[in-house]
Amino acid sequence: PLSQPKDEYVVSQIKWDWASQYVTEPVFTAPLVYVHEPDAHSGTPFFKHNHQPALTWCDNGDLLAVWFSTNEEKGREMVVLSSRLRAGSSEWEKPRMFYQIADRNLTGTALLNDHQGTLYHINGVEAAGHWQNLMMTLRTSTDNGQTWSKPRMIAPEHTKRHQVIAGTSITKEGWFVQACDAGPGGRDGAAVHISKDKGKTWTDPWDGASLPDFKEGGTGTTIAGIHAGVVQLKDGRLMALGRNNSIRDKEGHLRMPMSVSDDMGKTWHYSASEFPPIDGGQRLVLMRLNEGPILLISFTEHPYRTPKEERGMMFTDKSGKSFKGYGMYAALSYDEGKTWPVKRLLTNGTYRFLNGGAWTQFFEMDEGHAEPRGYLAGTQTPDNMIHLITSRFYYKFNLAWLKGNESIISPQSLSN
């Protein structure tokens, strides 16, 4: 038999000095490609559809991004690839194999750094093709992702409510919260799986009830919207925002649904958020920043499915003037999701013509237009820099940049 060539891939094990990287001035970097084609001789499979990423930071200062590569989203050829932005580097490495199970669809990937030296990787594994009957697997790394433990089944049934969504978080109790799509359809809502023992055992607090009527003031046991982002509020409640299952506000406009749980995910209370709904080829990020506020990154509309008269959102430029902007934006809340006084389009105004890959494809970026679609994943490093990936691009910015166009500084933001 042919001998396997030795893998020369080495990851630094030196702890990164995050404090030395801290900056107070505003930072926003131009979008940088992180999904590269592998070298032809590398043996790394690379299919035409590269999508649904996850992102985390490593203790050595590297960023680790992963995504699925496949020809068909239902396909059994699917693999999960990874790329690394090494500390101090300005270019993402070419992809490497990250996770492969022969003839199994692997939809749904999440990464987490537990701030205690361990990385967690959670992934769906199908019985065959499609993404509707997944089990969930988990593995860990204590060497910055150079090696990983053997995968362990944490939700072994091939069933619904197991489609992993990037954005795993840790509550103030030290519990892990993993959101999953509750079904394969676009309006099936989302579930949460909770681990109170650092990933050893997991429970979905769902009571088995069928999908509720997602309406203003309604309650149910499934989050409104797929691909949901979940964040813990300071009072211990969970808050989620998701895609589809839109709810009409008082003016009759369809809005992104907000779900809030005061019993750690057993029941959810639904309301219309102030944000426009998102749709196919789009996924939001919802996370709490180290500095305190809650950050939402989403899109002003769907570029094809939103009626033209409903597209765009109002933003404020540096001079305090209002303008209508389109595409990916960030919003900040200083009062636990009640209001979002800071909103900024994720562009620095430079004209660019870019290919966003996956479902995004070609788009123009300028002072009034940001990336129009993409599956988002985000993380914040200990130096307080915010890192965001879309389906093909990597962005880096900080709170100072997000607040740069803030025309009115609220008392809450001053206290933060």
Identify the role of each PLM range.
Residues 1-416:
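Asp-box/BNR beta-propeller blade signature and adjacent active/binding-site loops
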